[in-house]
């Protein structure tokens, strides 16, 4: 590693799936060790440590929820629960020696770019001691995820309620819900998992849901030992299902078939009195569809009730619905979603112009980033799971690994190779790409007539990627260097790049590469025998390798 690379360091915020993937790539593929991950929770796992409510699990096939560098053939079933997924995240960190880079129970309060020293000053708080301090880094990576901070809902009278009230992501396990009257507000994936889970023990579960959802049968067979032995690869069949969200003849046909299938399933399981309330009046895909975890069946229970209304007021003892129906409850569960479109909440990030990231996004009328990763005026910053990177119906791990790969190519390798010391995307490139994305989203169901978490405060969809998951991979595979402003660096960067390539290869591959290079030079020499430039090339090559070797010591 070059002297300059040794001076580089990075801070990663978040030890969820994206942070783990970034740490692996830096440590084991770039052989770059000078990075630290700060995680506000007491361990790794991100959303799978945050969300521990009863019934919490994955709504995507488990084998699609595996890191490419740590394939897991041992998932117990098609859609696993939270404890098994969290254990997989912890095992991954242990297997690849990542824990030593991770500081838990430390929250990032914000960061500021210092142009004079080309460093980020990152403000941190130890949540165990309350001590606040700062650390400096050449590169700042946000891997905070999107399903961590609960939606900040405000209902009239919330402060009056004398029972227990909490969000699904802040589940209070100190509260015993056995034989209690429970209200569940919301009708997304979390609510669909919570209702059947708590209904087994509660005296009453009453759900408040203003609109319907597209439900599908949940394929969740238990895998045998033989099947687990046979699983070795991740297949991307689910990517094709995303076509149901596009305004193409194929997409419209697939969507109609999926909606018909969903209606048939709902009517076969849910009580007839709820059909009109459950079946949506918006197209499939406008909200994230739900693979039924037993929710529809639970509506047949005598202690479960669905009220298709909103909340007028919360009283000292319960809830008054929008039509005036009043009920008393012991517990109110807020299954009201997350601040998905409020990226990097609640950190205060200040860029090179002295303007905070959230203020800049207000001026842009919504969060935006070049290919979801880079933001103008914020040098040496990478956002993982940034604006418009969410896959419609594919693995979040595939999406975050794709973005990690792009951040490595577009930011870390140029800095390590000393191609530049500071890298910042051009505003023109960011605006051009953002406009193209929103134009593509315009006619998709993501922008349909429903209330969903894709749409931000300014009416823009700042979450969804408009194409197939693999199209984002194609789009980001080769960085477009014309989109960036670069400063600093060294004239030796091509030689440093060669040196890095060789240092990351196996001994056999290194020998093969050197022999191939020598053979190419010799062949070129034979073709232009007598031309002095060949000798210069050979001399320069030998001298370059010698210089790089000394520079790297």
Label each region the model flagged.
Residues 170-181:
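A compositional/structural signature marking long, glycine- and acidic/polar-rich segments
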Residues 181-202:
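Rossmann-like NAD(P)H-binding beta-loop-alpha module
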Residues 2-10, 15, 20-158, 174, ...:
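N-terminal FAD-binding dinucleotide-binding subdomain shared by FAD-dependent oxidases/monooxygenases
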